């Protein structure tokens, strides 16, 4: 069931075509990969490769059986052909070449440096080319995920001194079993939806984070997801728990090689925030967007946070510039009294990209507050949709929501769509909703051109100003990166 590719030191970069996507290289290396297809034996094989206990296998099998009873959804404001799930491989990892590769998943296989047997010289070279530090040096902790496995996690020992757990999901299953069993599937059940059920059945490595009571995480935590193998899907499972009176800021980034066929990314993120705790969760999404309506990543993700305790706070911030189709709604369940949910989003589509993204704010506790700031930019022949739900439950006395949804059109062939849903079951609630749709004005462009600014630079400046409310919520270095990605995505959208 495994496949080996000749291992070389060569890291090949894709430079062809009009698309400027410098992350589109692929890395040649030996891989341990399951044959294409999904069935109960494949689910068992994934669990066996990861040396998982019986309870985790049962979680997978229950989700797989639920998934078989579900139908693939197509209600989004975008089109994709029905996927052949037998045409994907559901496990791919760098191979050491000496065994069946389960050694890197065994308890104790992770070295003090945070690296394991999956971190080959080819994998390290790939992350170096991406600018992702898999060795300690920069003051940001990184969990590097390559296809189905975590290959390195930095600053684990330093964080452990304060009781912070920062490790791969696979390692957490072995070393922090009680915590994983306590929280796994509590926010996103294994049968939550079609793609969440698929994820639960074939889940690959994501990141597990636990911040103990009264601890403020001393550095940014981050995960970088890299898809390398062809005809594989990535199905990471991430769990983040902030105990009482704690704080953590977490960032994720991603990229994939240029391929001429779709690849599936169906992740699940569960965040649990206890009393007086705060979590900031930032995403800079840069999956391969496809080229001339060919290939790209299908980014079908379920992200959900539970503000369990009083005065808890969750902030989602996302910059979405990649993937052929983006379909995700990072959500907050505001159960604790006085809890706060925030959603800040920039979604840019160009070329033939399609996006249907937004958020859900579910108010349950008293005096809960939510803020939604969404900026959508459409260029080329793309379609960009915002879809949001604000739900005020009967118990949510004095709940408040503010929603601002702005769309910008660049060119005559793109589209922007808005689908706001409001359900209010408590008459003490206050809800505000603002929405605008605009084009870049000719007078704005003329003003810039008269001052020697090129048309592309002028559009980039105007769009960055349009998005400043969201970029200001990102950590500084990631805000700069998000602005660069925005400019690159707009390069061929003028005219």
From Swiss-Prot:
InterPro entries (UniProt xref): Fe-S_cluster_assembly_SufBD (IPR055346), SUF_FeS_clus_asmbl_SufB (IPR010231), SUF_FeS_clus_asmbl_SufBD_core (IPR000825), SUF_FeS_clus_asmbl_SufBD_sf (IPR037284), SufBD_N (IPR045595)
GO BP field: iron-sulfur cluster assembly
Region forming the signal peptide: none
Disulfide bond sites: none
Origin: domain of life: Bacteria
SUPFAM superfamilies: Stabilizer of iron transporter SufD
Similarity comment: family membership: Belongs to the iron-sulfur cluster assembly SufBD family.
Quaternary structure and interacting proteins, as annotated: Part of the SufBCD complex that contains SufB, SufC and SufD.
Function: The SufBCD complex acts synergistically with SufE to stimulate the cysteine desulfurase activity of SufS. The SufBCD complex contributes to the assembly or repair of oxygen-labile iron-sulfur clusters under oxidative stress. May facilitate iron uptake from extracellular iron chelators under iron limitation.
Protein's UniProt name: Iron-sulfur cluster assembly protein SufB
Origin species: Shigella flexneri
Chain's gene name: sufB
